[in-house]
């Protein structure tokens, strides 16, 4: 067995833990709080939230480190085990692989709406539910021989992490936009101007590698690069493995898991998005 470490940094957002193929065994908490600004009650709730997620994952917080910080920071270093033969990287995709996404996207749009105080209770609940849902299918997916690449969609958005898969395999990824699951009310909120600055910076960084079909809606660009807090797992697998992959997601309660594209031979663009 080899040791696996996963760093998870969260600001004032729900804590979530990614487990793309390994089994976590313990966590160390890294805490920085403005002690002259936040009450001990608020800090206690943040710590309790982290402990709750670790309890759900079945691991203890075995220690950690605290500092006085200008901004609130809470994170975990997670230690775990994974068999060397079952390490799933983001560079193993093969031509003909199907891409499956475990969670809907749009967290960045919802968080932008929250900051502007235009997010309703239902939208807030969907954001919290999505971001606090642990990616528990990871270890089971890693056991499947037909799964060739595995990563989680986080700060670089769906496009950024699909690009990482395509670059790593020296192939081209295809996304069918109409099949990408979105969190409720995200398109309407986006049209109202609720977008993060990170989305634009992401696109500035990698947009030149992406080709958008003429039928793709205008909001697609901002959502493809929308940063996700605790986004879903992005899997590439052989076509015959797809039913088992989807069944694993469903069994873990990921009912929005969907086929979003495929992997093809290398083209001029590393990522091609069709309507």
Language-model-derived ranges and their functions:
Residues 1-9, 35-37, 42-60, 67-74, ...:
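Glycine-/charge-enriched secondary-structure boundary and capping motifs
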Residues 133-140:
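A short, well-structured juxtamembrane/interface segment
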Residues 1-125:
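Glycine-rich phosphate/pyrophosphate-binding loop regions near the starts of catalytic domains
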Residues 129:
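Active-site loop/helix belt of alpha/beta enzymes
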Residues 120, 141-144:
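Non-catalytic interaction surface on structured domains
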């Amino acid at each position: 067995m080899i040791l696996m470490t996963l760093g998870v940094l969260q600001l004032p957002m729900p804590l979530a833990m990614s487990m793309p193929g390994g089994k976590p065994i313990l966590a160390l908490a890294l805490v920085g709080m403005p002690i002259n600004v936040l009450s001990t009650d608020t800090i206690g709730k943040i710590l309790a939230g982290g402990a709750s997620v670790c309890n759900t994952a079945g691991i203890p917080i075995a220690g950690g480190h605290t500092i006085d910080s200008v901004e609130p920071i809470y994170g975990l270093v997670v230690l775990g085990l994974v068999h060397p033969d079952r390490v799933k990287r983001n560079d193993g995709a093969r031509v003909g692989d199907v891409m499956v996404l475990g969670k809907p996207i749009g967290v960045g749009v919802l968080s932008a709406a929250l900051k502007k105080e235009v997010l309703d209770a239902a939208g807030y609940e969907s954001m919290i539910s999505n971001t606090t849902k642990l990616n528990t299918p990871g270890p089971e997916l890693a056991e499947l021989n037909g799964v060739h690449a595995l990563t989680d969609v986080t700060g670089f958005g769906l496009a950024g992490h699909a690009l990482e898969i395509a670059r790593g395999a020296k192939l081209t990824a295809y996304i069918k936009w109409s099949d990408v699951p979105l969190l409720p009310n995200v398109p309407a909120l986006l049209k109202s101007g609720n977008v993060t600055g990170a989305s634009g910076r992401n696109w500035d960084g990698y947009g030149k590698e992406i080709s958008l079909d003429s039928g793709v809606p205008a909001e697609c660009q901002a959502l493809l690069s929308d940063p996700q807090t605790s986004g879903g797992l992005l899997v590439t697998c052989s076509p015959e493995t797809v039913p088992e992959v989807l069944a694993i997601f469903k069994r873990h309660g990921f009912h929005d898991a969907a086929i979003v594209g495929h992997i093809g031979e290398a083209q001029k663009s590393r990522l091609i998005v069709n309507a």
